[in-house]
């Protein structure tokens, strides 16, 4: 599946908004099954843009969570602890 640069940029933006693959396919006018296959390959350009989009928003959310944890939010502190443990387990 060949996507244009514009479609890849849109894919990343929509993934950053946590749109589903079905929604993204409809919005960038590609076949849903083909897009899903490309994303599952993990090494395709589509997968790179899809996962980068998701991760960029996750990073923003984690920054906000960290700020709340630093201000004493128990829920944010717990979330940061879980993220830290997950990171350590992945090393």
What are these regions (language model features)?
Residues 10, 34, 45-46, 60, ...:
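Exposed alpha-helical structural elements
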Residues 55-91:
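Amphipathic alpha-helical protein-protein interaction segments
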Residues 1-19:
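Short, amphipathic alpha-helical "recognition" segments used to contact nucleic acids or chromatin
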Residues 19, 43, 73-74:
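Residue-level recognition of short, well-ordered coil/turn positions
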Residues 2, 36-54:
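Short, solvent-exposed alpha-helical "recognition" segments
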Residues 23-26:
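The alpha-helix within a helix-turn-helix
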């Amino acid at each position: 599946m060949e996507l244009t640069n514009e479609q890849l940029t849109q894919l990343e933006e929509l993934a950053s908004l946590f749109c589903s693959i079905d929604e993204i396919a409809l919005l960038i006018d590609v076949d849903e099954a083909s897009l899903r296959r490309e994303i599952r390959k993990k090494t395709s350009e589509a997968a790179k843009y899809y996962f980068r989009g998701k991760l960029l928003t996750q990073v923003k959310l984690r920054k906000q969570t960290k700020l709340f944890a630093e201000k004493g939010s128990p829920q944010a502190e717990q979330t940061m602890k879980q993220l830290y443990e997950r990171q350590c387990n992945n090393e």
